[in-house]
Structures are given as structure tokens and as C-alpha cells.
Design a protein with these regions (language model features):
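S-adenosylmethionine/decaboxylated-SAM
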Residues: 20-23, 27, 31-191
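Class I SAM-dependent transferase core
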Residues: 5-29
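Short, Lys/Arg-enriched, disordered terminal segments
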Residues: 1-3, 191
């Protein structure tokens, strides 16, 4: 994933439009369809959690959806802190949103927090994802959405799709969407 140049943006709305434009310009049309999936499944979501924040593209969607509590987990929040954090903090105050950031690995107890929707876009290996799912799955009330479930590192690879689907089936979740355009995303819903 590219590091978008976002020093010129002055609002969360502009950040969201610009990061999507730059990412899709670099990675192809439909790279950011996960943004649309977050919006599509946002009904009834008040508490959002994201593991793997990078610069905050999907986090900006959560802000624009005005989820009441947004938890952002990443081993390094430096890229988020550089551009989105200052915009997010003022936006959160204006819209009565609580933002919680945790600079830690998504497989650790320190990363735990309950949510209605969990978005996973961290380390793209099934062995890593299964640990995140086993730790966080019981704390998610509605949806788990994973990015990069059809292509990883430019090559067809559905290991994250299979991991999420199989974990979901074993734990009472239902597969509701599997998008294979570009890098893809997958959505499961608590059964």
C-alpha cells in the first residue's frame, strides 16, 4: 500500500476523498471498496474497531459515519498521527465521537475492546488473522470485515477469506459478502 501525500488536506471529508483517490490511482479501481462496505453495513453500528490503521483511510470512513466510539489499533500509529489525527480530533469533538487509539499488536490483550463492527487490515497472513479473530471475535456484536481477501502482495491469494469464513462457520457467524474485485474484502455477520 502506498503512503498517500495528505499534507494539504484540511478536513476529514477531504482526507477521505484524497486518500481514496490516491490509493485507487496507485492500486487500481475498486481498491477502496472496503470503504463502501463499512458504509453499507453501518446501520445500527455505534462502536467501531479497526486493527491495522496505517494512514487511516478506513478510519476516516468510520468518522464520517459518525460512529460514537472508534477504536484504532496498530503496532505503529505514526502515519495516522501525521495527517488524520489532528483532523479526527477536532471532528470528533464537533460530532460527539470518542476516539481510542492503541499502539499495540492486535493479537495482544492490550488491544481488546468491544465493538459492533471490527475491521481487520493488519498483517496479511492467516496464522496472524486467526489469533486476532480468536481474541476479538467474542467482543464483536454485529460484523467483522477483512480487507485483502482475494489478492495479497499483487498475487491471487484467498487465505484471509478462507480463514475468516472458516472461523466464522466454527463460531456461529454467517458469510454475508465476499467481494473479489481488486484485493477484495469479506464480511461476516454474527449469526
Amino acid at each position: 500500500m502506498i503512503n498517500a501525500e495528505l499534507g494539504h488536506v484540511t478536513s476529514v471529508e477531504e482526507f477521505n476523498k484524497e486518500i481514496r483517490r490516491q490509493q485507487e490511482e496507485a492500486h487500481g479501481d475498486d481498491y477502496c471498496l472496503i470503504h463502501d462496505a463499512i458504509r453499507k453495513y453501518s446501520r445500527g453500528v455505534h462502536n467501531y474497531m479497526e486493527i491495522g490503521v496505517h494512514q487511516g483511510g478506513t478510519a476516516s470512513v468510520a468518522l464520517l459515519e459518525k460512529f460514537k466510539r472508534i477504536q484504532l489499533v496498530d503496532i505503529s500509529l505514526s502515519r495516522y498521527n501525521k495527517f488524520l489525527k489532528p483532523l479526527a480530533e477536532s471532528y470528533a469533538i464537533e460530532n460527539n465521537i470518542e476516539i481510542v487509539t492503541k499502539e499495540t499488536d492486535g493479537r495482544t490483550i492490550a488491544s481488546l475492546g468491544w465493538s459492533d463492527m471490527l475491521v481487520i487490515d493488519s498483517y496479511h497472513h492467516a496464522a496472524h488473522m486467526i489469533k486476532e479473530l480468536n481474541l476479538h471475535g467474542g467482543t464483536v456484536r454485529k460484523y467483522i470485515i477483512a480487507h485483502d481477501t482475494s489478492i495479497i502482495n499483487g498475487r491471487p491469494d484467498d487465505q484471509l477469506f478462507r480463514c475468516l469464513r472458516d472461523w466464522g462457520e466454527a463460531n456461529g457467524w454467517k458469510l454475508v459478502e465476499h467481494c473479489v474485485k481488486n484485493v477484495g474484502y469479506t464480511v461476516i455477520k454474527r449469526g
